[in-house]
Amino acid sequence: MCIRDRNTYALEGSIFIAGAGVQWLRDKIKLINNAYETEIIAKSTKTNNGVYVVPAFSGIGAPYWRSDARGLITGLTRDSDWKTLVRATVESVAYQSYDLFRSMSKDGLKPKIIKIDGGMVANNWFSQFLSDIIDLQVIRPKILETTALGVAVFAGYKSGVFKSLKEITSLWKKDRDFKPKISKANRNNLIKGWNLAIKRTLV
């Protein structure tokens, strides 16, 4: 992207299934009636009980890039129930984000905070879990649909509605921030389980 006649670069990583995983829970296997229920359900469970969902419904994106990968549910026992499956599906987005940041760190990216957006981050439980897994402060904006906002403001910038990038920047307002709360040992254990699930998916 060119801003003020200067090329500006960014690292990008694709997660193929994020909010679409929640749609799958709602539309295909009928475990929920709407996306908002996932927060209540996740809060009602103490742990994932070792259950992981790898939502590779159309392959898996960065950093694995395997179009032949398919979805997997692992760790099921007789104690597993539908609530565990809902929680594990929501958790999967945080784990996939962790994989992206781990990959980006190898290219020298070491962020101190993360700004999130999109409909899924309205879920307070998920936003906190994301912070716990990536071990960084996560900041949520008041306007969740940042992509749509970005299109609008850049159109406004080009047409002269906004006079400067500083003016555009001032439109972004913080709603809430989330800071890591879980122990290092707990985080490592959760990630270890995810890594095993990924390994099984990629066999």
Predicted features and spans:
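Active-site core segments that coordinate phosphate-bearing ligands/cofactors
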Residues: 4-203
